[in-house]
């Protein structure tokens, strides 16, 4: 769920921005390096951004009276790793704040840490952990049978 504009005191907004900025910088550096090697990644970057934008714009009602939504960063993090996904997430969250009023500019740092940095890092770690695991083993271990 996006943190709305004006919800956080300015001191906390600053703290979240200080945490988010290094990820954006590292992501931009990795993105520049990737695109210098091969510009063919541009369409895939666009698809990942569109996927995140569409999926995170879907609202699912929750019991508490607010709503939740998937972020869709898993696809991007499997293709481009966490730093580049942070840049894609930043662009998506910026567009959502400006066009859909989901979140705000002052709370963009906090929204980034939760949706464009934290989630993708966890997703990437799970992906790396399970990447070489057999599909049959995973399906057996995830089956809900007594």
Task: For each feature predicted by the language model, list its residue ranges.
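Membrane-water interface at transmembrane helix exits
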Residues: 28-32, 55, 60, 96, ...
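Membrane-helix interface "capping/anchor" motifs
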Residues: 33-36, 77-87, 133-136
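Short helix-perturbing small/polar motifs within transmembrane alpha-helices
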Residues: 115-146
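Hydrophobic transmembrane alpha-helices
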Residues: 2-10, 22-75
């Amino acid at each position: 769920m996006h943190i709305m504009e004006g919800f956080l005191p300015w001191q906390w907004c600053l703290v979240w921005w200080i945490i988010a900025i290094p990820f954006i910088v590292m992501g931009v550096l990795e993105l520049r390096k990737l695109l210098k090697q091969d510009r063919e990644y541009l369409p895939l970057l666009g698809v990942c951004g569109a996927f995140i934008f569409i999926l995170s714009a879907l609202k699912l009602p929750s019991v508490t009276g607010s709503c939740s939504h998937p972020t869709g960063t898993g696809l991007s993090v499997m293709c481009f790793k966490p730093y580049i996904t942070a840049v894609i997430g930043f662009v998506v969250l910026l567009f959502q704040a400006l066009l859909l009023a989901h979140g705000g500019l002052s709370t963009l740092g906090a929204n980034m840490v939760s949706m464009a940095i934290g989630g993708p890092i966890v997703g990437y770690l799970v992906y790396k952990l399970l990447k070489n695991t057999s599909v049959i083993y995973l399906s057996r271990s995830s089956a809900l049978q007594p």
